[in-house]
Each structure stands twice: as C-alpha cells, then as structure tokens.
C-alpha cells in the first residue's frame, strides 16, 4: 500500500494557489493557452520557469497544473480539454473560504481510491505477473476494499495517542512502518496501539521502503492545514494547537468523514469525471468546513 499524491508538495502555499487559479481565469471555459498562462505565472513570479529540455520552452503550467486537479479545483485537462474550475475553486476565488480552510477541507476529503490517481505503476503490475487484470489503480484499490482518507486517519491516530497519554506526534519512520499499512478507517485504533507498543519496545514492523517519498509528501501537505504542525525538516507531524483547542469540532468532522457512505464510490465508465464532480463539489460539503477563526 502507498498513498500517491502530488510531487509538488514542497511549493504549496497561498501565493501559488492564488496565482495558479487566477491564471486559470485567463482561459476559463476555453482550451488552455499554455503560452498565455506560462507568461502570467512568470510575470507574477510564483513559480520557476521549468524550461523543458526536449523543447527548450517554458512550461510551468504543464508541470504545476496537477496541483489544482489533485485538490479538485479544476477538472483534469486529460479528461476535459476545456479549462473548467470546480464549485469549490469558485468558492475560494469569491473569498468564501480562506486558504487554510480550503486546504484543510480538501485534504480531509482526499481519499483512496479516487478517480485522479488511476495510473498503474509498472512495479505493481510486475509484482502480480500474469494474474494482474486491472485497468486502473482505482479499480485495483476498489477490488481490494481500500477505503481510506489519510488526513482523517492521521488525525485520529494522533488524537488517540494524545488520549492515551502518549506524545501526540508521529515520525516519518512511524508513518512508513505503521500508518501506511492501514487499509480502512477502522484501522486507526489498532495502528495507534502498534505505535504505542513499538515505543515501549513490544513490537516492531519493518518500514515499507517504497512508501517513504509519499509519506514525506503527505507530511508537507498536512503542514498547510489548520490541524497539523511539523518540524522544519518535515520528518515529524503533530496535532496543532487548533486541533487541541477545537478537538470536539474536528473529531466530529473526522468521524463523519470516516463513515463509508461519505466516500466516493468507483463505478466503471466515466469514473474519472465523476470523481471531479464529487471532489470539486462545494454545497454538499459545507458541514465539513473547519473555520479558521472560531
């Protein structure tokens, strides 16, 4: 098991979100004019030019647009050639949501399986050999009954550690050895117990080597939310002061987002587009918004 997520976690900040979304407005409802968007991104100075070796052309948009599709702010341009912003992106642009509120909401709702991270890795296919017959990573995870929201899971594990009198902090090694092994939301309690036992020398699981990069990216992303704090090296994650102060409200949201019926369900056909319909929805997710000022 691994949790694939954008590899651009390190550049995520308010200015980047604002700049990329405003760049989208230049081509909203139209085919992407990459040159126009790239020039705008360079002009406002939010990201590097990213000159491609094969063409010697600036292509910041091609490299960074996945940040927006990853978090349900635009439909992936692979499935919709017209640049389409989702309702949740418009709520942000209309100042209904602040950046911390938006990123907290979307990371709490981010789930596996989903319709965006659908590409199969060659190593996964190879590991199953001739018996592998899945057309997408989404179908593969669905078949194996994966149903997971990493941000919610991590919060609940940290909260359980806090309730048990343990230090409410997870190291990257603990994420890699224990947390990533979870396949469902109910695993959070067993996972917390494994971690507590390991801290007292009673159990030790070998780290899942291939998961380390994804775990590190998740820690970086979660540092942008209201709920978590990290150290400067992004190799530990802890509950933020907001999480402790507002623990009843956060726990309520996390409990609701742990319920099976709250998850998007994979169905063959237009599952990729259906994912963006679900994940980019605003009105049906207002109840999950944790306000920055309370």
How should these model regions be labeled?
Residues 1-294:
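Donor-sugar nucleotide-binding helix/loop cap in glycosyltransferases
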